Amino acid sequence: MTYCLRIADIPTNERPRERLMTHGPKVLATAELIAILLGTGQGPGKLSAVGLGQYLLQELGKNQRDPLAVLREVTPAELMQIPGIGPAKATSILAAVELGKRTFQFRPLDKTPIDSPVAAVAALSQDLMWQNQERFAVLLLDVKNRLLGTQVITIGTATETLASPREIFREIIRQGATRTIVAHNHPSGNVEPSPEDIELTRQLLAGAQLLGIPLLDHLILGNGNHQSLREITTLWNDYPQGD
């Protein structure tokens, strides 16, 4: 696709909107998705909407940054510093970004059973999934694994959070939960557990055994990804929870 052409000059079957209607959004390049939001082009060299979308990504990706990571937190003023992006285009982009975030912020209805990592992630997403700082949170459950609530225990830096078993269990007991799932986020989006994550999980499982409050899982979330430590470790075999 030629980025200097107007959308009207591109063959119909190659235009982003028509390709989305025919093949679905997954086949479109990121610049094409942005082009649909922009509607029109311009900027340096009178770019097409697709060209302007590509140029925007290049500008956001300067200094070896991930352009999509920058886009998630960009401000209107920052977008409008890019040639060709005025208030109308900036607000369209930011509205789409916010809508995308909110689709990950669905919370189950009260008393919904949490019967899978996916259900737990849905309940925790608003607190953890897109945060810039590491957070540690708990899902508070009743004896039938029904959701009583969520609670953020600690907020750390961009690279670490501090959570102790004492703080975690104190909140669980205070809230009257009889079962729990713990979770934290990795702002980088890499949801592989660190040695510290494994050790904390070990301590929590041992504490849960002593208190008789089953720990059902430890989840790591970040940038749309998640990982269940129960699914990828043998810790629950070492510390059975009676669940």
UniProtKB/Swiss-Prot annotation:
It comes from the Bacteria. Zn(2+) binds at residues 184, 186, 197. GO terms for biological process: DNA repair; proteolysis. Residues 113-235 form the MPN domain. One of its GO terms (molecular function) is DNA binding. The keyword Cell membrane does not apply. InterPro entries: Hlx-hairpin-Hlx_DNA-bd_motif, MPN, RadC_JAB, UPF0758, UPF0758_CS, UPF0758_N. Pfam families: RadC (PF04002), UPF0758_N (PF20582). The keyword Protease applies. A motif (JAMM motif) lies at residues 184-197. Keywords: Hydrolase, Metal-binding, Metalloprotease, Protease, Zinc. Belongs to the UPF0758 family. This is UPF0758 protein alr2351. It comes from Nostoc sp. (strain PCC 7120 / SAG 25.82 / UTEX 2576).
